[in-house]
């Protein structure tokens, strides 16, 4: 059945994503300040340089990071990895980030430029090996270091640091490229021990997003004291279930970095892997990272739909994730979602070619596939395949209603175990081609 043009157009009405997803206020972790400026790297003169600074001196800070797996790792990635390794995740007190130029595939000169950015900030804060650097933007072009250097000096020289809401929001804006809205999330948490702490996160990304991260930068800061090894374990666990579970277009960038700083401004005992609160904090960080990662998908270039791919009852978490990833990255699935076409064959095809670690994870006679409505309308579930048998007489009207939603779920029940994984993806539209065809201009 062909979808009516009226229904198709209704689902593609512009969503005011800025109003929906950008907070109006917030409270932020103690002991952090942020600064920002428009250095002139971006042609349109918008904000393109930011600094996150730990001002708490009551105890040493800790840091952790997860970097891109792309073989062409950008200069900021290689440089920041070296800083973290040398520091062993301790006493990292600043992050400097620019947008508009990725400083990627720029050779030795690019490495020197990244190091200059680090050295400039280290000099301003009077510390050595205490700064991480990140860049995002066009690949293959050198940074305009005169503008970057002037911008860093301006941020520090004019005391452009603040801890208020607008300061944090402007830093979130300074890392945007093709993003249609800045991604800023902040939340307070309470542990069973009674300790209260805050997590604040920022991210950028709208295209080149796929598992193992893509053109994606993410920062999470907290005032909770966390031992460096415990922090790295938390962030790795959280990233595996958040930023590595999103897909926009299946492209993996050279600059991906997710980092987390813990400054210990809260007066409580440091969390380590043996602490009674460790597992609770790990889960809270994971849920927080998922919220932040989902904003990246919601801002997918040209997207009109946010789609949760839920794979459950698998033998292994890893295989559940592989299947969810395969569905999420399928261009045919994504274009069918855009066209509101209930083509479940494309979903089964993506499941079938998924490169599973254990072939026993998939039994074609046990699989169930459904579309799930997220707007509380009934019937909530529309079964497409039941115990391996295609439902040939599905309710096409109901299918059209579900696929017209801005948010929907694809549910896959493998029926072979008890493990589950989620991915978040979006549809693929004509607008995606337009945005990326004009990117460098």
UniProtKB/Swiss-Prot annotation:
Binding-site residues, substrate: 177, 204, 215, 301, 436, 441
Annotated site (Involved in the stabilization of negative charge on the oxyanion by the formation of the oxyanion hole): 136-137
Pathway annotation from the record: Amino-acid biosynthesis; L-arginine biosynthesis; L-ornithine and N-acetyl-L-glutamate from L-glutamate and N(2)-acetyl-L-ornithine (cyclic): step 1/1; Amino-acid biosynthesis; L-arginine biosynthesis; N(2)-acetyl-L-ornithine from L-glutamate: step 1/4
Broad class of the protein's primary localization: mitochondrion
Free-text activity regulation comment from the record: Inhibited by ornithine.
Quaternary context: Heterodimer of an alpha and a beta chain.
Protein known as: Arginine biosynthesis bifunctional protein ArgJ, mitochondrial
Gene behind this protein: ARG7
């Amino acid at each position: 059945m062909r979808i009516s043009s009226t229904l198709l157009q209704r689902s593609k009405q512009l969503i005011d994503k800025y109003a929906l997803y950008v907070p109006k206020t917030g409270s932020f972790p103690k002991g952090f300040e942020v600064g920002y400026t428009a250095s002139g790297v971006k042609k349109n003169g918008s904000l393109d340089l930011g600094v996150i600074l730990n001002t708490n001196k009551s105890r040493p800070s800790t840091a952790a990071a997860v970097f891109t797996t792309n073989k062409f790792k950008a200069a900021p990635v290689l440089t920041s990895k070296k800083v973290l390794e040398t520091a062993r995740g301790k006493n990292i007190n600043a992050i400097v980030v620019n947008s508009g130029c990725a400083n990627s595939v720029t050779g030795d000169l690019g490495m020197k430029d990244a190091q200059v950015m680090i050295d400039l900030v280290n000099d301003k804060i009077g510390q050595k090996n205490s700064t991480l650097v990140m860049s995002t933007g066009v690949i293959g072009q050198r940074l305009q270091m005169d503008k970057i250097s002037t911008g860093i000096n301006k941020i520090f020289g004019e005391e452009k640091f603040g801890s208020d809401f607008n300061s944090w929001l402007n830093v979130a804006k300074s890392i945007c490229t093709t993003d249609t809205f800045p991604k800023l999330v902040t939340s307070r948490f309470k542990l069973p021990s009674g300790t209260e702490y805050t997590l604040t996160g920022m991210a950028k990304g709208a295209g080149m997003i796929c598992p193992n991260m893509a053109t994606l930068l993410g920062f999470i800061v907290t005032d909770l004291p966390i031992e460096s090894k415990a922090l790295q374990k938390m962030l790795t666990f959280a990233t595996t279930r958040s930023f590595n579970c999103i897909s926009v277009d299946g492209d993996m960038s050279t600059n991906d970095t997710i980092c987390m700083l813990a400054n210990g401004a809260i007066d409580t005992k440091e969390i380590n892997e043996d602490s009674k609160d460790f597992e609770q904090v790990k889960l809270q960080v994971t849920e927080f990272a998922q919220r932040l990662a989902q904003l990246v998908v919601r801002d997918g270039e040209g997207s009109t739909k946010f789609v949760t791919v839920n794979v459950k009852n698998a033998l292994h978490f890893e295989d559940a994730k592989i299947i969810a990833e395969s569905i999420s990255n399928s261009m045919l699935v994504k274009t069918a979602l855009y066209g509101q076409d209930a083509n479940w064959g494309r979903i089964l095809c993506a499941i079938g070619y998924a490169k599973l670690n254990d072939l026993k994870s998939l039994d074609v006679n046990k699989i169930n596939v459904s579309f799930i409505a997220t707007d509380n309308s009934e019937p909530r579930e529309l079964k497409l395949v039941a115990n391996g048998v295609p439902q040939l007489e599905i309710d096409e009207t109901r299918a059209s209603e579900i696929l017209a939603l801005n948010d929907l779920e694809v549910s896959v029940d493998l029926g072979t175990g008890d493990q589950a994984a989620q991915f978040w993806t979006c549809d693929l539209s004509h607008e995606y081609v337009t945005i990326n065809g004009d990117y460098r201009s």
